[in-house]
Amino acid sequence: MFSTLIINRCATVSGKSAAITLKVSPSYPSAIWFREHRGEPAPESWNSKDVSNAEGTLELTLLDRIREGRVGVTYTAKVVAAMRSDVDVRPTLPETVCLKFAKQEFSRGLAREAWFYEQIEPLQGVSVPIFYGFFSSPMVEQPGFPNLEFTPWTNRKYSYEDTTDSPPNNINQYPSQDWLPDDVPPYRGRPSHNENPSGYQQNSPWYRWNYTQDNPTVSVIVLELLGETCTGLRGPEVK
């Protein structure tokens, strides 16, 4: 696991291309859904992966935009360099990877997606893409801030209002505006099926994360790049 991610051509400052630098970040664990036997402790593997021992730097160059979704935007990126313990590990990586950047409002949700990749690690490279890490940083830490224009956030087709349901009436009871299904409070005092007996969720730095307009969080998942782009087209000529 790399501790630092550099992405070239990922921003502009005064019209000139600029790089961004992100640090490895813990993912955001889910609560546990109990059908019965409530209060059981969560297994240690349920927690986010320990990133304290991460080392090395992965350097990429942003290439082409793939697609925009509800919470993020995907790009291809070229692997420029990969060093760990002063050893060049680039030969162990593909030439090109996939980057999924969170939109400004959804870094918490992307942190949860990173946790799912950690949980299904044995399936990586088999039925799901290989996960190379989750990285994030406050925008204020980037050189050129606040005059930096972050490329993945430009030309946004779908706004927050277009892709998100109306906030719940009791959103003030939720730990974050970027709420997830396990944030929903119990209905009228009924016991919730979602529990956090081991504290993994509430102890996460993402538990009360919220989007800050003056200093948004940049976050990205680095994944194996799979096959051709899915166009949504159907027909005998489309495989």
Report each predicted region and the residues it spans:
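Juxta-kinase regulatory segment immediately upstream of eukaryotic protein kinase catalytic domains
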Residues: 1-68
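ATP-dependent kinase catalytic cores of phosphoinositide-metabolizing enzymes
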Residues: 2-6, 10-13, 17, 25, ...
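Short linear interaction motif-like sites in intrinsically disordered regions of transcription factors
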Residues: 34-35, 47, 116, 154, ...
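Generic detector of short, locally flexible boundary/turn motifs and exposed helical patches
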Residues: 38-42, 93-99, 184-188
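Short, charged, low-hydrophobicity "junction" segments
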Residues: 46-48, 105, 196-200
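ATP-binding glycine-rich loop module of kinase domains
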Residues: 48, 54-125
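Conserved structural core of kinase catalytic domains
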Residues: 121, 128-238
